[in-house]
Amino acid sequence: VLLVPQRSRTASRKQVDIKKKYLFYHSYREWNGVPIMAANMDTTGTFAMADVMAKIGHVCCLHKHYELRDLVSYYTERNLSVLQYVWYSMGMKATEFVKLKQFYTDSGLQPNICIDVANGYSEGFVDFCRMVRKDFKKSIIMAGNVATPEMVQELILHGGVDIVKVGIGPGSACTTRLKTGVGYPQLSAIDECVHAAHGLKSQDKRHGLVCGDGGCRLPADVVKGFAAGADFMMLGGMLAGTDECDGEIVNGKMEFYGMASESAMDRHNVPHREYRGVEGKTVSVPYKGP
């Protein structure tokens, strides 16, 4: 896939402004920045990554395995100029919702929230998102992952979600498509889901948004995602190997793994049940520096 060149009034690349201003379907917060997100993976969704991304107006979705006390400490030690670019991540377990509510009690903050599950089509996911929205009306809520327009509409209209995370299996450390045969071509998924999200208008003309998650191995892939209409693009592998990632440097390389990989299961003491398949892999990526 290539983009056809178009006529432009831009005389130089330095005239290009890649910042965006967004209003949201449910949350009445406004957001200004560069709509590129660091993925909420163990290795990339770190406090260090969040600080660096915030400095340049990018987003970091923290991974969900931080201890509550560490999250409260991080959030209360930083001001809004940083926190508007940080997303609190969680799954859909009851214990994670309890943790989120305790975070609010301890910090007094309603954070931007990323509700992340492997299968956004599971029964109860929309209900869970709606429950979070009921208690966190001010938060910008992003949820996924899905890959089809009907679920995008369902999450926005009935789940109280502002941004739908789109992508089933395109990540460089994900093997879902190979193991299960489930997925949808990523560029097509973004294109079709964007039409569904942008077609939904609230009473004051705010519409749903889409974040393309996965499939970006080169800068050109990010460009194509935006060309397909994505409002945000999420990166994992492209940011892996930097100083801000969680991992040791061994022979000039750093470890990067998918969140459904055996490495992730072992790290977080997830039981290897007979019904649970490994849908991610562990790779070594070159160390890239800061």
Question: Which ranges hold each PLM region?
Answer:
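Active-site-adjacent beta->alpha loops and helix N-cap segments on the catalytic face
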Residues: S12-K14, H65-N79, K93-Q102, V117-I141, ...
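Short beta-strand/loop segments at the ligand-binding rim of alpha/beta enzyme cores
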Residues: R29-A38, L80-S89, L109-N112, V132-A147, ...
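N-terminal capping/small domains of soluble enzymes
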Residues: V1-W87, Y257-M259, P271-P290
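Alpha-helix termination/capping residues and helix-transition junctions
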Residues: K55, T105-L109, D135, L157-G160, ...
